[in-house]
Amino acid sequence: MKLHDIDPDNRPRERFLQHGAAALSPAELLALILRSGSQQYNILDTCHHIINRFSLEKLSDVSLKELQQIKGIGESKAMQIVAIFELNRRLHYSRNQLRKIMAAGDVFEYMSGRIPDESKEHLFVLHLNTKNQVIKNELISIGTLNTAVIHPREIFKSAIRESAHSIIVVHNHPSGDVNPSNADKKITNELKQAGAFMQIEMLDHVIMSKTEWYSFRERGLL
């Protein structure tokens, strides 16, 4: 079934024209780009399946092979999806290439609007060069921050790969309360020790909400 076979009120194209892109769900936006499905699979249902299986946050890292395992997604459509995220990465890089970080306020400004779903906790690592310029912003995990899911080796493996001189760890608190939990303090201490061993300095750990931040460095805890 193709998009024009869907009820007019539910067609992504018509909804886009009437309400704008912001009114569409991620699956609808993807369906609008891919345009048509196969004889067996409605493209909108296929796109919902893609988002549900991989999540929007992780979709940018999904391979062609993984995408082609989805029924209704062949090589051509898989390439379209990968190309979308590659273009977005290049746009993001061109806008933020070598952004200099001097204080926690710069981290807050840099990260504002970059958390895909603020109802969940996200952990990011900013990789910096010797001039404190961001060379990469990497999403490490989604969910409650604890030692069961976050290990220093995952953080510093990425930092080594990017040839980072130092890192800044950033995560959000969906509750809006940016005060650190005991788990936050424990992980910060573990990462500080691991960084000293690896000779990659952990400059700060910043906890964010939509309106404020908490800096371990500025509070004298790093």
Curated annotation (Swiss-Prot):
Coiled coil ranges: none
Motif (JAMM motif): 171-184
Keywords associated with the record: Hydrolase, Metal-binding, Metalloprotease, Protease, Zinc
GO molecular function annotation: metal ion binding; metallopeptidase activity
Residues annotated for Zn(2+) binding in this entry: 171, 173, 184
Transmembrane domains' residue ranges: none
Residues of the MPN domain: 100-222
CDD domains from the UniProt entry: MPN_DUF2466
Cited InterPro entries: MPN, RadC_JAB, RuvA_2-like, UPF0758, UPF0758_CS, UPF0758_N
GO biological process terms held by the UniProt record: proteolysis
A Pfam family that the UniProt record links to this protein: RadC
Homology family: Belongs to the UPF0758 family.
Protein name: UPF0758 protein Cag_1513
Taxonomic source organism: Chlorobium chlorochromatii (strain CaD3)
